[in-house]
Amino acid sequence: HGNRILIINNGARQTGQQWATDHAPEVDINESGNILVIKGADGVRYGSDALGGIIVMEQPPFAFGQEHPKGRIATFYGSNGHRYAATGSLEGTLPFLRNIAWRMQGTYSNSGDRSTAHYLLNNTGTRGLHFSASAGYDSGRLRIEGIYSHFGEQTGVMFGAQMGSEDLLAERIRLGRPVYTDPFTRHISYPYQKVVHRAAIGKVRYNAGAAGVFYWQTSWQKDDRRENRIRRMNHSDIPAVALLLSSI
């Protein structure tokens, strides 16, 4: 996505470290109730930096007035990498104040080595743990919302992708496959990438009648990315790249 596609997540610009083609947005689509893609002139309202368009992700509306909590659970399985995932959410209101609503949501995913048609891609497993909590208050004229989300993912990098020299890379390309392949495993070893993205968003909307509608929003995001490679002298546990990005 880089700097050509803008992501609006729950009303806030998604700010991650967008400097590599293998860095996907740090968002959990299961958290969203509505995803909208905007292209063309309509995207000007979000700024001039989104040349490729805008992806707007919004959480479902709060269940104000709902008497009993309700939830959902969904599971997923993928044959390539024997990936499985589970996501669930629970929402409701306070028993004594139905105009105060809350929601909790979480997703866990686990994948092992991926494969092509003829061989395994060792060390390409993934682990993901994402969760969010939100609450809202609605008095008719005044609405207040608060959202906190945590996105955590670890992704293995295929052993054959880290080459010691250009000659070795040329040899692997000529062979058309890795020299050695191990049996399937879910274990993630070096090299790998690990990212943790945290976000907190606050919104206030007040309807002043004839004076108009006033809207205020603020957000805080913190993106922690670490990339570990196979290093000599047992120093693989020291990240080759460790970047921390905070934004308000």
Q: Which role fits each region the language model picked out?
A:
Residues 1-4, 9-248:
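Outer-membrane beta-barrel proteins, especially TonB-dependent receptors
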